[in-house]
Amino acid sequence: MSLSVAEKSYLYDSLASTPSIRPDGRLPHQFRPIEIFTDFLPSSNGSSRIIASDGSECIVSIKSKVVDHHVENELLQVDVDIAGQRDDALVVETITSLLNKVLKSGSGVDSSKLQLTKKYSFKIFVDVLVISSHSHPVSLISFAIYSALNSTYLPKLISAFDDLEVEELPTFHDYDMVKLDINPPLVFILAVVGNNMLLDPAANESEVANNGLIISWSNGKITSPIRSVALNDSNVKSFKPHLLKQGLAMVEKYAPDVVRSLENL
């Protein structure tokens, strides 16, 4: 979205005022309306599609394969494609790296939940396609991954768990599936405008923001990584430490409501 100098000044003053006035009438902690559809890709173990009110859209597919975890200890892999961006574009590589770090960290996905036997485990592939995005897409992607993983079903093991002394591959039931029992982390993005923090900034809010903040949430608490991110190329400034505390407190207060909403799909 391209705003004139006068529009930027008016919008910035509105967002930086006390209380802040957002163009769409949202309170500082409120998210844009979204639609989420799950389990719609028949060839995947789990899937989700999320559409935001501004037309941003993201699809996530979850697939799995059986690996020897003594040979391959990375049991989760995230790949991100963003329409209109090269695979080696900075924004794609940054988001891919962030999501891999969040999901593979100690507070991320518990790899023991993927273990089949003493020798074999499931490896989960998370494929993300951002069809359109009008603002920073990391929160939208995070919500889509959360919904897809929570709708994932894996084949039911019927062979023995102890297979270290017996050379046999895991055997699965022909029809029965087991729901993947994990608690995926979430990633929130906030905009810093003056002395105010705004959750889920829209495109026009991002254009006038002084800075951005990415905060991760897992298992009922804030976790690493926490990092700043530039939401535009022309208005980036440093921010004071008390704004970081304000952003952390906002996520800590409202993240449980987001988790409950996503779990009730």
Curated annotation (Swiss-Prot):
Which subcellular locations apply to this protein? Cytoplasm; Nucleus, Nucleolus
Q: Chief localization class?
A: cytoplasm
A Gene Ontology cellular component where this protein is annotated is: nucleus
Specify the superkingdom: Eukaryota
UniProt feature coiled coil, ranges = none
| Record keywords | Cytoplasm, Exosome, Nucleus, RNA-binding, rRNA processing
UniProt entry tagged with the keyword Nuclease: no
Give the GO terms filed under biological process for this record: exonucleolytic trimming to generate mature 3'-end of 5.8S rRNA from tricistronic rRNA transcript (SSU-rRNA, 5.8S rRNA, LSU-rRNA); nuclear mRNA surveillance; nuclear polyadenylation-dependent rRNA catabolic process; RNA catabolic process; RNA processing; rRNA catabolic process; TRAMP-dependent tRNA surveillance pathway; U1 snRNA 3'-end processing
Gene3D superfamilies attached to this UniProt entry: GHMP Kinase, N-terminal domain
Per the similarity annotation, which family is this? Belongs to the RNase PH family.
Its subunit composition reads: Component of the RNA exosome complex. Specifically part of the catalytically inactive RNA exosome core complex (Exo-9) which may associate with the catalytic subunits RRP6 and DIS3 in cytoplasmic- and nuclear-specific RNA exosome complex forms. Exo-9 is formed by a hexameric base ring of RNase PH domain-containing subunits and a cap ring consisting of CSL4, RRP4 and RRP40.
Q: Which PANTHER family does the protein's record reference?
A: EXOSOME COMPLEX COMPONENT RRP42, EXOSOME COMPLEX EXONUCLEASE RIBOSOMAL RNA PROCESSING PROTEIN
What is the documented function of this protein?
Answer: Non-catalytic component of the RNA exosome complex which has 3'->5' exoribonuclease activity and participates in a multitude of cellular RNA processing and degradation events. In the nucleus, the RNA exosome complex is involved in proper maturation of stable RNA species such as rRNA, snRNA and snoRNA, in the elimination of RNA processing by-products and non-coding 'pervasive' transcripts, such as antisense RNA species and cryptic unstable transcripts (CUTs), and of mRNAs with processing defects, thereby limiting or excluding their export to the cytoplasm.
Q: What else is known?
A: Present with 7110 molecules/cell in log phase SD medium.
Supply the name of the protein. Answer: Exosome complex component RRP42
Q: Which organism is it from?
A: Saccharomyces cerevisiae (strain ATCC 204508 / S288c)
